[in-house]
């Protein structure tokens, strides 16, 4: 028996290639696919990868033109200081990953009470280069600057914090500052 998905839409879904290297950008260009650069994985050289993708793009039956999306890790809060505080749980999670510990994102209290060595503070600073954080206006300005620098056609954000409600608030504040929803 044949299996047929229902309902059938008028078009096929868009195909994206998510990557964080020049290889993935070149592959997306060669195959005529949309490309999402994973800034949240690697911020280094991504702007050049995006420019090369657009320059080398080969139209395909699926996509006539290049389309580039920038995926960014964001933590938005009412104040810059609060965003910095909320980032601490992710800082500790990334340190744990550096140590080979694959555990859930720690809660805020655990992150705030942890004593860090100088080397760990350096690792935190290294990882923070891939994060946009702050109050809504700060985050908006940084995201728009990144979009221009990377020549992105679209932005996509990912927010990870120590609890669901702060993630939800981050998205709500972003939606508000970008006027994507009606104020509550």
Q: Which residues does each predicted region cover?
A:
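Flexible loop/turn segments at secondary-structure boundaries
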Residues: 24-25, 44-45, 77-79, 163-166
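Residue-level signal for short, function-critical loop segments
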Residues: 21, 41, 74, 161
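An alpha-helical appendage that flanks or caps ligand/catalytic pockets
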Residues: 1-4, 44-150, 181-183
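Hydrophobic faces of well-ordered beta-strands that scaffold small-molecule active sites
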Residues: 14-18, 33-38, 66-73, 153-157
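Short, contiguous strand/loop micro-motifs
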Residues: 10-13, 129-130, 161
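Generic C-terminus detector
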Residues: 147-184
């Amino acid at each position: 028996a044949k299996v047929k998905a229902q309902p059938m839409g008028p078009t096929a879904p868009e195909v994206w290639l998510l990557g964080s290297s020049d290889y993935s950008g070149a592959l997306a260009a060669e195959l005529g696919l949309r490309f999402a650069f994973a800034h949240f994985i690697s911020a280094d050289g991504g702007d050049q990868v995006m420019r090369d993708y657009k320059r080398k793009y080969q139209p395909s039956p699926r996509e006539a033109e290049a389309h580039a999306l920038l995926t960014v890790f964001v933590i938005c809060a009412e104040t810059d200081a609060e965003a910095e505080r909320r980032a601490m749980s992710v800082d500790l999670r990334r340190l744990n990953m550096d140590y080979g510990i694959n555990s859930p994102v720690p809660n805020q209290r655990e992150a705030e009470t942890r004593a860090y060595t100088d080397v760990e503070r350096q690792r935190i600073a290294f990882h923070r280069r891939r994060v946009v954080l702050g109050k809504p206006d700060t985050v908006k300005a940084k995201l728009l600057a990144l979009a221009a620098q990377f020549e992105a056609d679209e932005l996509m954000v990912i927010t990870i914090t120590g609890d669901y409600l702060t993630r939800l608030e981050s998205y709500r504040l972003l939606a508000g500052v970008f006027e994507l929803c009606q104020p509550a």
